[in-house]
């Protein structure tokens, strides 16, 4: 693997296999209650400009279970919040730490940090991309379906960082990705154009969610308004209402289709409680797998 994991595009075919095999091993070891501490003596810095539940807990617990230490750093805890340059912070933290995970708004910040750091930098989430989530989702699909190859994976909702990262994944791996977003809420145009050109099994964007979901193996959604878009919540709710994942919208999907959501979910908005808690939903396993996949990433990179 490359030094950093900022995007799915940082991974080659062999890297996906290595991460998923390592995650499978780490999950088995965890379930057996066997101590496995390859990162003993190693420290991960975790920089958070955005609040988090799953990202913080999974990385912090993951480092602990691997024998290492995780340091939580908000923008109030570092000189980054007081005017120190990203480049200076990256160089200095590289002397203290063995790796950095960053959850921030601008993707440019994490790219600049990685350019000046001499230690691995992991993208815990930016407004543009969320690679760790998609890797965990792919691992979950392998567990539930045996493989993601040749499947039809459908994303319904806002063209946000999750949608962008799914497009990146479809350009690297052999599955068909269909996206359904309201007009004006499409994924990043540059990412979409590249994904359409490079996709192994095809990337398609359509307005009709029922047509998108037809014969789907996996149906995926996310919140309609991401962090920082709270002022748009009411307007977005009106636009996105036809894109709610409910029993009617799932009817064109395959009978054994699974439903995924990266969480947190707004029940009754992008997805109904009946579907979220229903037999097709794999959201709890999906959330758990953030821990195992990110542990695999940490062990490989650090």
Curated annotation (Swiss-Prot):
It holds the Pfam family OTCace_N. Its EC number is 2.1.3.3. Keywords: Amino-acid biosynthesis, Arginine biosynthesis, Cytoplasm, Transferase. SUPFAM superfamilies: Aspartate/ornithine carbamoyltransferase. GO terms for biological process: arginine biosynthetic process via ornithine; citrulline biosynthetic process; L-arginine biosynthetic process. It is an enzyme of class 2 (transferase). GO terms for cellular component: cytoplasm. It catalyses: carbamoyl phosphate + L-ornithine = L-citrulline + phosphate + H(+). Carbamoyl phosphate binds at residues 52-55, 79, 103, 130-133, 262-263, 290. The keyword Amino-acid biosynthesis applies. Belongs to the aspartate/ornithine carbamoyltransferase superfamily. OTCase family. Reversibly catalyzes the transfer of the carbamoyl group from carbamoyl phosphate (CP) to the N(epsilon) atom of ornithine (ORN) to produce L-citrulline. This is Ornithine carbamoyltransferase. The lineage of its organism: Bacteria, Pseudomonadati, Thermodesulfobacteriota, Syntrophia, Syntrophales.
């Amino acid at each position: 693997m490359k030094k950093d994991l900022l995007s799915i595009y940082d991974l080659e075919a062999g890297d996906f296999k290595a991460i998923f095999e390592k995650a499978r091993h780490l999950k088995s070891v965890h379930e057996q209650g066997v101590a496995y501490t390859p990162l003993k003596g190693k420290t991960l810095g975790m920089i958070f400009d955005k609040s988090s539940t799953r990202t913080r807990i999974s990385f912090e617990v993951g480092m602990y279970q691997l024998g290492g230490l995780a340091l939580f750093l908000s923008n109030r805890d570092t000189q980054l919040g007081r005017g120190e340059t990203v480049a200076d912070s990256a160089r200095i933290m590289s002397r203290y730490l063995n790796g950095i995970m960053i959850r921030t708004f601008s993707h440019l910040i994490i790219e600049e940090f990685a350019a000046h750091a001499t230690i691995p930098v992991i993208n815990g989430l930016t407004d543009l991309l969320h690679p760790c989530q998609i890797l965990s989702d792919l691992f979950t699909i392998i567990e539930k379906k045996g493989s993601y190859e040749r499947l039809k994976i459908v994303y319904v909702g806002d063209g946000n960082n999750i949608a962008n990262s799914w497009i990146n994944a479809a350009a690297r791996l052999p599955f068909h990705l269909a996206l359904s977003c309201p007009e004006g809420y499409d994924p990043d145009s540059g990412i979409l154009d590249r994904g359409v050109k490079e996709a192994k099994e095809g990337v398609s964007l359509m307005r009709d969610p029922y047509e998108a979901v037809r014969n789907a193996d996996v149906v995926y959604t996310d919140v309609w308004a991401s962090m920082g878009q709270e002022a748009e919540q009411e307007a977005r709710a009106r636009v996105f209402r036809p894109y709610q994942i409910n029993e009617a919208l799932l009817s064109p999907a395959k009978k054994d289709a699974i439903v995924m959501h990266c969480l947190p979910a707004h029940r009754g908005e992008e997805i109904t409680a009946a579907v979220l808690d229903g037999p097709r939903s794999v959201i709890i396993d999906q959330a758990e797998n953030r821990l195992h996949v990110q542990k695999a990433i940490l062990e490989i990179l650090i």
